[in-house]
Amino acid sequence: YLLVYSLASRRRDLPMLPPAKEHKRFAILIPAYREDAVIHECVHSCLEQDYPADCFDTVVISDRMQPETNASLAVLPVRLVEVHFEKSTKSKSLNAAMAAIGNDYDIALVLDADNVIPYDYLSDINDLFANPEVEIVQTHRSAKNLNNDMALLDAISEEINNTIFRLGHAKLGLSAALIG
């Protein structure tokens, strides 16, 4: 099993898709449970996208973050949805945000609060969704913290999973395993 997908991941690159002719509307959803220390870097990477600003909203779902963090986010061009649950879960936060923001979007993109995205991320995803056969996209996660042995092992594990369980499957025309 692992050998087949490992070898498949080494096959030639997937075909490049032509650029999209229209800009789809994105809701970038960032559930943030006590993520005060990392949320700003994630938000800034979203706001710095090379994509029309009127075609995406960055939605921070603040669950038990500090009032100071919420105040600093409120002055940015983001939609801040504050939630309070007795028992917090990511799915509860996402459902609350979807109810709060409405249906004015073509694509919902979910990021973890410690993710950062490259400046062309939305454009690349928009190009993928221009293909009518594409219904869902799983993007490549890379570790940004490599400063100790455990973090390095986590990064190696992440790359193995990206290669075998996602890229190998995709290059064989199969659905990739979801992560995140």
Regions found by a protein language model. Name each.
Residues 104-116:
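Short beta-strand-to-loop acidic/aromatic patch adjacent to the donor-nucleotide binding site
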Residues 44-55:
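Short, acidic, metal-binding catalytic loop of nucleotide-sugar glycosyltransferases
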Residues 82-97, 101, 119-180:
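Long helical/loop segments within the catalytic core of UDP-sugar-dependent glycosyltransferases
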